[in-house]
Design a protein with these regions (language model features):
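Substrate-binding/catalytic cleft of secreted carbohydrate-active enzymes
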Residues: 103-104, 113-207
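Secreted/periplasmic carbohydrate-active enzymes, especially glycoside hydrolases
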Residues: 1-128, 132-136, 170, 179-180, ...
Length: 207
């Protein structure tokens, strides 16, 4: 579709950015889950030293008060489910074929969205949603600091919440199926008029 090249020297900080223009892109949606590939190559002279392929889609999202969620400029109601990671009786181990089978069943019943309750999603799930056309609300964690269960995330929240949420966003920011980030599930702090809004704002700023 397009190409670009940028040269660097051994004295550079090894961090650089490029901008590409895609004219008349095919937009990603549940009905037309079109994907592109960005192929990054690093050369030393004429020798290829490294190559990395990033799959991505092109789409716009917007939430308009009193009107709803808009995908590619079109109002798009969510017809979704809370999707736990355990794949029913198969257990918690990631099974790509079972994930895709599950998504086909969901699409057949009219679903267009998944909330990854109540954990960060596996890459295999997001890749399947990209390819098969399912919008995703990617959930971060099930607990903040207040106790819900004895061995919950609250024990590591202060140490890991920012790192985990940041990593979640960076890992899936190129995936067109991910249209929302979820900062917590049924957290008790939401009923605290002081702590709840402060923590919510703190986590939203990371997103």
């Amino acid at each position: 579709v397009t190409t670009n090249e940028k040269q660097g020297t051994r004295f550079d900080d090894n961090v650089f950015s490029q901008e590409l223009v895609v004219t008349h892109p095919a937009l990603w949606s549940p009905e037309t889950p079109v994907l592109y590939q960005a192929v990054s190559k690093v050369y030393e002279g004429n020798t290829l030293k490294d190559e990395y392929v990033t799959s991505f889609g092109i789409r716009t999202i917007e939430v308009i008060p009193n009107k709803g969620f808009f995908l590619n400029g079109k109002r798009t109601p969510f017809k979704g489910v809370c999707n736990h990671h355990d794949l029913g009786p198969l257990g918690g181990a990631v099974n790509d074929a079972a994930i895709r089978h599950q998504i086909r069943i969901l699409k057949d019943m009219g679903c267009n969205a998944i909330r990854t309750s109540h954990n960060m999603p596996a890459p295999e799930l997001i890749r399947a949603c990209d390819e098969m056309g399912i919008m995703v609300m990617a959930e971060s964690f099930d607990e903040w600091k207040a106790m819900k269960v004895r061995n919950g995330y609250r024990h590591v929240f202060d140490e890991w919440a920012v790192k985990d949420l940041t990593n979640l966003i960076r890992h899936y920011r190129n995936n067109p199926s991910v249209v929302m980030w979820c900062i917590g599930n049924e957290v008790p702090e939401q009923w605290d008029g002081n702590k709840g809004p402060k923590m919510s704002y703190f986590l939203q700023e990371i997103c």
